[in-house]
Amino acid sequence: MEVGQEYEIKNFTHRKFSMKHIAVMTSGGDAPGMNACLRAVVRAAHNNKLKIYGVLNGYEGLIDNQINKLTPREVGNIIQKGGSILKTSRSKRFLQEKFRALAIKNLTKKDINSLIVIGGEGSIKGAAMIAKESNLNVLGLPATIDRDLPLVGPTIGFDTAVNTALQAIDRIRDTASTSNTC
């Protein structure tokens, strides 16, 4: 990542927010905890009497207008599930300005003024682009097993991924030691 991009992301994370209608999306590779995060966002919005929309398939869904209302009932039983109920994608189209403009238009047509993006490095870069190119309030929630985001400590999913790998290694070692192969 170039220094200029870090600066843009730093500025983007310090914007003031005034949320009325919110869209939330997951993007890029999935990470453990995305559904739990999504559930928390939807419940918080509902408790504050805000309209909340879910974007299916990440940035591709923004471009294709796959934006639907979400209720607490729809996210009520997802906390223990892996992946993302909203699905994710990596979008090459979103890198083109005309498709970003279409994505922004799709949000504003539904009177959405705030976007929450749950994802890793590429997702957060995309969120920074939207923040820069629109009047939308944009919040990036880092969720990546790679822990490759600048200026960010632990991310949603990193600790779970590391501990899952460690448990698997411990089990393999235990199995190997019982057959005298170690």
Residue ranges and their predicted role:
Residues 178-182:
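Conserved anion/nucleotide-ligand pocket segment
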Residues 6-18:
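Short, Lys/Arg-enriched N-terminal segments with co-localized hydrophobic residues
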Residues 17-63:
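N-terminal phosphate-binding or glycine-rich loops at protein starts, especially the Walker A/P-loop
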Residues 36-41, 121-136:
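Short Gly/Thr/Asp-enriched flexible loops that form oxyanion-binding sites at enzyme active sites
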Residues 62-117, 123, 154-170:
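Glycine-rich oxoanion-binding loops at beta->alpha junctions
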Residues 53-55, 131-155, 159-164:
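Short, acidic/small-residue loops that bind anionic groups at enzyme active sites
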Residues 27-30, 55-61, 90-91, 120-123, ...:
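Short, ordered loop/turn segments at secondary-structure junctions
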